[in-house]
């Protein structure tokens, strides 16, 4: 499972349960209280963060998440309100 899949799964759970849910991003893992994803060695999360999904499944808290490896930076642009996500890959200089 990847970040995008866990993001969408958390979004679906919040919509199905009609309850707010949090996706917690920490140095070594990402979790939503039901599922947990280990961040592989060699990938760094820019900072510990929490994404809150409202009961309609929309992201109501955070605009971007950034991961980096030795070779590239992967940034996720999270659109507030509608819960859409866009992946942007950039080579490191």
Please name every model-derived segment.
Residues 5, 12-93:
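N-terminal helix-rich module
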């Amino acid at each position: 499972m990847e970040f995008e899949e866990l993001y969408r799964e958390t979004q679906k759970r919040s919509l199905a349960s009609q309850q707010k849910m949090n996706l917690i991003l920490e140095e070594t893992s990402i979790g939503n209280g039901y599922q947990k994803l280990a961040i592989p060695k060699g990938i760094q999360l820019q900072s510990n963060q929490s994404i809150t999904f409202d009961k309609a499944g929309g992201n109501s808290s955070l605009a971007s998440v950034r991961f980096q490896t030795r070779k590239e930076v992967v940034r996720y642009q999270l659109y507030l309100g509608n819960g859409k996500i866009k992946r942007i890959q950039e080579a490191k200089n």
